[in-house]
Amino acid sequence: MADGKIVQCIGAVVDVEFPRNAMPKIYDALKMAGSELTLEVQQQLGDGIVRTIALGTSDGLRRGMIIQNTGNPITVPVGTATLGRIMDVLGNPIDECGPVSHERTASIHRKAPAYDELSPSQDLLETGIKVIDLVCPFAKGGKVGLFGGAGVGKTVNMMELINNIAKAHSGLSVFAGVGERTREGNDFYHEMADAKVVDLENPANSKVAMVYGQMNEPPGNRLRVALTGLTMAEAFRDEGKDVLFFVDNIYRFTLAGTEVSALLGRMPSAVGYQPTLAEEMGRLQERITSTKTGSITSIQAVYVPADDLTDPSPATTFAHLDSTVVLSRDIASLGIYPAVDPLDSTSRQLDPLVVGQDHYDTARAVQGTLQRYKELRDIIAILGMDELAPEDKLLVARARKMQRFLSQPFHVAEVFTGAPGKYVSLKDTIKGFKMIASGELDHLPEQAFYMVGTIEEAIEKAKKLN
């Protein structure tokens, strides 16, 4: 492979000149002689010059420095060697536990599986979170999005799902921290170690691999770190395993793409996003899929800028998901956590042919009651409860009980709530909401339903209140 030399360096964008007959291909990785820095080719400008993005700090780069073409895209370690380890976008370990002794590597750029290789599943994945299991159930091998603005609980919900699914799940998990806080990555690692999902003594016995590209890193790292995590998940899937793939946060992937696009001088599109937003998102999401060999179940946190679900970034993500869990600031302000909006959240699995008629009817009854309560709230605010018809008063009382029963203490929030976390089976969830909807519990006060697990706990709590 021919060497090139730097001809221009503006921030994270580095132009490199090569002999005209030896120009690198798009996405080829370039290495700097005597340095750890990697550049990734983004554009061919002609005359032997390629425009690259630095995957690391570009401090100290000068014109004339020698750059080596590797001839291949970025490759990262895959397989059991990655378990229990924290790696960066290039697959280098950042957990101070020595090198990753891998037997094989894989390119982070690859095509999505062909249509005839796909294997969609209709099996349900129980999460133990009442509101999710009832109104937006997850599918094994499906894609789930947790949508929410700043501070409504996306990361806490993600941690609880990891706690409930990954710990009980016999398969493997891959966690990609994309442009999130370093503190959260650190907390996650220690939490996994405490739960024995990460085995510090013998990392090969761990069940999770972690890839981090944090907020403070250059845009190139944040743009590619999701692909690094996905490549590791795909390798486990292709070995015939069932993999959980967690991404926190997919919006930062879009944002990094916007930064890179601006640095490369592309004309922005709506709201300043990159013109290639749909294509970049599609290329990532189409690879997160289950094949006849194994499955990838993906759970992605999606930040919603200014709580606007019509923003191009969350709107583009919506199209690729099987289940959407929408977190609402209005519900959080009532003190109801998880702050999932049961009227906005959707799932393709909520179909009587998939979940069964009993589950479907219960979920629709709950949504219908809450929708009617939402319509009556304006009348209550202006005229008061006394002006409502008797049947509407009864409906409002049931809706308020349902709303409170949708709250639940989380295991990961025990530290700051002081209440022990609860895992509620789907059978108990359906039973509880059926009893409220049928009017069996009309005599109990609504406070009894707040922050409990099963309906039996609510009945016990009501006795104590009386």
From Swiss-Prot:
<keyword id="KW-0547">Nucleotide-binding</keyword>
<dbReference type="GO" id="GO:0045259">
    <property type="term" value="C:proton-transporting ATP synthase complex"/>
</dbReference>
<dbReference type="Pfam" id="PF02874">
    <property type="entry name" value="ATP-synt_ab_N"/>
</dbReference>
<dbReference type="InterPro" id="IPR055190">
    <property type="entry name" value="ATP-synt_VA_C"/>
</dbReference>
<keyword id="KW-0406">Ion transport</keyword>
<keyword id="KW-0813">Transport</keyword>
<dbReference type="InterPro" id="IPR005722">
    <property type="entry name" value="ATP_synth_F1_bsu"/>
</dbReference>
<feature type="binding site">
    <location>
        <begin position="148"/>
        <end position="155"/>
    </location>
    <ligand>
        <name>ATP</name>
    </ligand>
</feature>
<dbReference type="GO" id="GO:0005524">
    <property type="term" value="F:ATP binding"/>
</dbReference>
<dbReference type="InterPro" id="IPR004100">
    <property type="entry name" value="ATPase_F1/V1/A1_a/bsu_N"/>
</dbReference>
<dbReference type="GO" id="GO:0046933">
    <property type="term" value="F:proton-transporting ATP synthase activity, rotational mechanism"/>
</dbReference>
<dbReference type="Pfam" id="PF22919">
    <property type="entry name" value="ATP-synt_VA_C"/>
</dbReference>
<comment type="subunit">
    <text>F-type ATPases have 2 components, CF(1) - the catalytic core - and CF(0) - the membrane proton channel. CF(1) has five subunits: alpha(3), beta(3), gamma(1), delta(1), epsilon(1). CF(0) has three main subunits: a(1), b(2) and c(9-12). The alpha and beta chains form an alternating ring which encloses part of the gamma chain. CF(1) is attached to CF(0) by a central stalk formed by the gamma and epsilon chains, while a peripheral stalk is formed by the delta and b chains.</text>
</comment>
<dbReference type="InterPro" id="IPR024034">
    <property type="entry name" value="ATPase_F1/V1_b/a_C"/>
</dbReference>
<comment type="function">
    <text>Produces ATP from ADP in the presence of a proton gradient across the membrane. The catalytic sites are hosted primarily by the beta subunits.</text>
</comment>
<dbReference type="InterPro" id="IPR003593">
    <property type="entry name" value="AAA+_ATPase"/>
</dbReference>
<dbReference type="InterPro" id="IPR036121">
    <property type="entry name" value="ATPase_F1/V1/A1_a/bsu_N_sf"/>
</dbReference>
<dbReference type="InterPro" id="IPR050053">
    <property type="entry name" value="ATPase_alpha/beta_chains"/>
</dbReference>
<dbReference type="GO" id="GO:0016887">
    <property type="term" value="F:ATP hydrolysis activity"/>
</dbReference>
<keyword id="KW-0066">ATP synthesis</keyword>
<dbReference type="GO" id="GO:0005886">
    <property type="term" value="C:plasma membrane"/>
</dbReference>
<dbReference type="InterPro" id="IPR020003">
    <property type="entry name" value="ATPase_a/bsu_AS"/>
</dbReference>
<comment type="similarity">
    <text>Belongs to the ATPase alpha/beta chains family.</text>
</comment>
<keyword id="KW-0997">Cell inner membrane</keyword>
<protein>
    <recommendedName>
        <fullName>ATP synthase subunit beta</fullName>
        <ecNumber>7.1.2.2</ecNumber>
    </recommendedName>
</protein>
<keyword id="KW-0139">CF(1)</keyword>
<keyword id="KW-1003">Cell membrane</keyword>
<keyword id="KW-0472">Membrane</keyword>
<dbReference type="InterPro" id="IPR027417">
    <property type="entry name" value="P-loop_NTPase"/>
</dbReference>
<dbReference type="InterPro" id="IPR000194">
    <property type="entry name" value="ATPase_F1/V1/A1_a/bsu_nucl-bd"/>
</dbReference>
<keyword id="KW-0067">ATP-binding</keyword>
<keyword id="KW-1278">Translocase</keyword>
<dbReference type="Pfam" id="PF00006">
    <property type="entry name" value="ATP-synt_ab"/>
</dbReference>
<keyword id="KW-0375">Hydrogen ion transport</keyword>
